[in-house]
Amino acid sequence: LAVPALAEGVRDANAAYNELLAGFNGKYPDEYAGAYVDTSDGDKLCILLTERHADTAAKLGAAQDKMLAHISAAYRDDVKFKTAKYSYNELLAAHDTASELLKDKGYGLSYVGINDMNNVVDVGIIPADHAAAAAFVQADAALSGLPLCVTAAERLSQLGGESPAAMPQAGGGAIIPLAAALLICGAMLGAAALKRKR
């Protein structure tokens, strides 16, 4: 399987992202609302800052400086900033709350994950449970105010032991190995770019 080479901008944006996360050391500051590579704008790392920490020019500058302090000068041209409503910590809490409450109610979860670009938690519910789960989310006091996007989604197996008839028929069998290969290649290219830039 040939994996296409990543553009230099994507490699540099990934390297900047890896440095940012390493600088956080597992503790996200309240100013941080997520990050993603914006391929529509020159393959830049778009770091999201919470609106309440960027509502004045002084706060915005301080929040940007705080993020850039974790990124080496060689990659700072590959970074841009936008604002978002929810901090990453708030999204993590929403993720945990939604996962726990929906599992406790017996709804079939396909996935639960943070969507940095849209500043929400994506929740995939198996189609048979989707309507009831969506109604539960809207009615439940603990869930209704959270940044959740609930959709119907089939489960993708990560075990590999199911028969082909039990698997989603949209080519789902090859998705996980390909995604893993791309992640590994991206990490290797990011590390190589980091060594090259320093």
Residue ranges of model-derived segments:
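A cross-kingdom C-terminal cell-surface attachment/processing module
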Residues: 174-196
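C-terminal segment of classical bacterial N-terminal signal peptides
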Residues: 1-7
